[in-house]
């Protein structure tokens, strides 16, 4: 099945483009946002960044961003990562194996 994806030369850019076209990109983003909010990750990250600013009011944006980015990526729950990867895989496989055409799949 994975060979089919590569044999059709589906580049990352093409996959993202097709995910946008099908609406799956927005759906995946919304689901990720919901899951991160539901598990308290967004609140945890907000509190973390506020704590940094409160302890060092002279911190520049770039340092705050780098610190927050590292903490953010490390603290995403594994269950959220696995669910997202599963959903992405399903979408990519759907793109690689489109449903038969409206003519009932008859090949000429």
Curated annotation (Swiss-Prot):
Gene Ontology MF terms in the entry: chromatin binding; transcription coactivator activity
Free-text function comment from the UniProt entry: Involved in mRNA export coupled transcription activation by association with both the TREX-2 and the SAGA complexes. SAGA acts as a general cofactor required for essentially all RNA polymerase II transcription. At the promoters, SAGA is required for transcription pre-initiation complex (PIC) recruitment.
HAMAP family, per the entry: ENY2_Sus1
Keyword field: Activator, Chromatin regulator, Cytoplasm, mRNA transport, Nucleus, Protein transport, Transcription, Transcription regulation, Translocation, Transport
One annotated Gene Ontology cellular component of this protein: nucleoplasm
GO biological process, one term: transcription elongation by RNA polymerase II
Family per similarity comment: Belongs to the ENY2 family.
Gene name of the encoded protein: sus1
One Pfam family matching this protein: EnY2
Family matches, as InterPro entries: TF_ENY2 (IPR018783), TF_EnY2_sf (IPR038212)
Protein name (Swiss-Prot/TrEMBL): SAGA complex subunit Sus1
Cellular location(s): Nucleus, Nucleoplasm; Cytoplasm, P-body
Assembly description: Component of the 1.8 MDa SAGA (Spt-Ada-Gcn5 acetyltransferase) complex, which is composed of 19 subunits tra1, spt7, taf5, ngg1/ada3, sgf73, spt20, spt8, taf12, taf6, hfi1/ada1, ubp8, gcn5, ada2, spt3, sgf29, taf10, taf9, sgf11 and sus1.
